[in-house]
Design a protein with these regions (language model features):
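Charged, amphipathic alpha-helical stretches
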Residues: 1-118
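Alpha-helix boundary/N-cap detector
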Residues: 34-37, 41, 98-102, 124, ...
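Charge-rich, solvent-exposed alpha-helical interaction surfaces
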Residues: 42-49, 78, 82, 92, ...
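Surface-exposed polar/charged interaction patches
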Residues: 49-56, 89, 114-118, 143-146, ...
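Long, mid-chain structured domain cores
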Residues: 93-266, 270
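Short, charged/polar micro-motifs that form catalytic or ligand-binding hotspots
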Residues: 177, 196, 237, 242-245, ...
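Long, internal scaffold/assembly segments composed of regular secondary structure
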Residues: 230-374
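C-terminal structured domains
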Residues: 351-519
Length: 519
């Protein structure tokens, strides 16, 4: 069945809460905003917003594009100073070994001096909780082991913890401990908004499952909570500003279904989030490509021809690279079409521009007035023609897309585990073990023949691995049967090596979800 276009009348709502952009085009197409972000930060930003909405009692309540959805995030100022801005902790413990009073007195003096300039705090509450200074030292060491992406050379106020519980969730901070958007770029918040637009049944079921993982009080959560002070002031002011343009989109339910299927498995809590980060990056990538397609005149999902890692180049590898470039380059065509349609859909403006009795200055002024409002265009006035003005706006819009959206697409493909340069000097679609495992966990509720899994991956995500699906949709010159059959055989071997498949005596391969089924 043909998908309805997401750009149909009534499915988009404009953003009216302030536009943080020199030209609001990419944001109007993909949202505010799609920007390059590390995988651990994408997951953490999503969970921060989810937990903040849970505290409000609005977790996965339905949202609309025109709403400015705001939430309070944890500052965790004291926690971060203790963990990441505390250089003398080990020295004090060594120097005053055996004397808790001396150790606490020296450390409290040191930490007050370290925190005095921009983040003054009273850390004396820790002495009451940890009479033995060594217990405090061991607690700090234990929590430091849960740092996500350790050794990444980020500033100390940007270091993030694995989400052991809500007390381990907080937002990257600037020098004054306000929200810093260099690491949390809003892409994780876009993921939350996508889920909030899924069908009601999916939202309710997913909210029930994820709420349990975001509530406090667990043993793991208490480990981090022990370093936090009590009382008020633990949360920042409510912040919003993230915009997702579409009321409905095929990507919303697809993402919600994947996460719900994952949440329904009896995975250890750490594994749930480890798999989840790949699923949300992958689904956000699909959302972006599919959105580009709609603006380019087709409601079909993007095709992902995937090489299962090979030692040499073949037709599959060649087309997987071509396919990736074609998919991501459509973003620029989407920008072009958006700008053209914006002008064409304003009948009053088109009438002025077509009126031969109007001077060029009047036409340019009318065009400038309209686009300055719609696009938040910050452009110095110059005496030019209408066509020059249009070209200038198009150039600015495409430059912004090249700065933000194109790198974001490349980053999402890479961090999801969908793309790689391994064995070549160009990126191509070649899924990693982590992504393959995530897709199996989200799509195999019970033992299934491998061919049926391949059918599902094709129907659901447009992933092409075998000759069966390649021959349905690819140009004839890129369908070499033997190459795709070898690609499928490598996929089988990968599944078996990951413990996700077994080849039976009848030569039929069965794929299993290790948390739902045993062969």
């Amino acid at each position: 069945m043909k998908e309805e276009s997401i750009i149909r009348k009534g499915n988009m709502q404009p953003w009216t809460h302030g536009k943080e952009s020199d030209i609001w085009v990419s944001e109007a197409i993909w949202g505010h905003r799609l920007k390059e972000q590390p995988l651990h930060a994408l997951l953490a930003e999503f969970l921060n917003m989810a937990e903040g909405m849970l505290r409000q009692g609005k977790f996965l309540h339905a949202t609309e594009p025109q709403q400015d959805i705001q939430y309070q995030a944890r500052k965790a100022k004291e926690l971060r100073v203790i963990l990441f801005h505390n250089p003398t902790l080990e020295q004090v413990a060594e120097k005053h070994n055996g004397s808790n009073e001396d150790a606490w007195a020296q450390w409290l003096k040191n930490i007050q001096e370290a925190a005095r300039s921009s983040h003054p705090s009273d850390f004396s509450y820790l002495k009451d909780r940890f009479p033995n200074f060594r217990d405090f030292l061991n607690r700090v060491h234990l929590i430091r082991r849960s740092v996500m992406n350790p050794g990444n050379n980020k500033k100390w106020s940007h270091q993030l913890l694995f989400p052991m519980g809500p007390s381990a969730l907080y937002v990257p901070a600037d020098d004054k401990f306000g929200r810093d958007r260099t690491l949390f770029t809003r892409s994780g918040e876009l993921v939350y908004l996508m889920l909030s637009r899924a069908d009601e049944r999916l939202r309710e079921e997913l909210a029930k499952q994820l709420s349990e993982k975001l509530k406090g009080g667990s043993q793991k959560d208490n480990i981090t909570l022990g370093l936090l002070p009590g009382g008020q002031g633990q949360f920042d002011d409510a912040n919003g500003g993230t915009y997702l343009p579409y009321l409905s989109h095929p990507a919303y339910n697809r993402l919600a279904e994947d996460l719900l299927n994952l949440a329904n498995l009896e995975l250890p809590e750490n594994d749930v989030f480890d798999v989840m980060k790949h699923l949300i990056a992958f689904n956000l990538y699909l959302y972006a490509l599919e959105t580009s397609n709609h603006w380019c005149g087709t409601s079909s999902p993007a095709i992902l021809v995937c090489e299962v890692m090979n030692t040499k180049s073949d037709v599959v590898r060649q087309y997987s690279g071509v396919c990736k470039r074609d998919n991501e380059d459509k973003a620029l065509k989407a920008v072009e079409n958006y700008c053209e349609q914006l002008i064409e859909n304003n009948q009053g403006l088109c009438k002025i521009l077509a009126d031969e009795q109007q001077t060029e200055d009047v036409k340019v002024a009318s065009l400038d007035e309209f686009l300055s409002g719609e696009l938040s265009l910050k452009r110095p006035p110059t005496k030019i023609t209408v066509e020059d003005y249009k070209k200038d706006v198009m150039r600015l819009a495409k430059d912004a897309c090249r700065r933000n959206v194109i790198p974001a697409l490349a980053s999402l493909g890479r961090i999801a585990g969908l793309t790689t340069k391994q064995g070549t000097n160009r990126l191509r679609y070649a899924p990693s073990d982590s992504l393959i495992r995530a897709l199996v966990l989200a799509n195999v509720p019970e033992r299934v023949e491998e061919v049926k899994l391949l059918d599902k991956l094709f129907e659901r995500y447009r992933i092409v691995i075998s000759e069966t699906h390649a021959s349905q949709i690819l140009p004839e010159q890129f369908v070499e049967s033997s190459h795709y059959e070898k690609n499928k055989e490598r996929f089988t071997r990968r599944l078996m090596a990951l413990g996700l498949a077994t080849r039976m005596s009848d030569a039929c391969t069965y794929v299993k979800n290790p948390y739902k089924d045993a062969i």
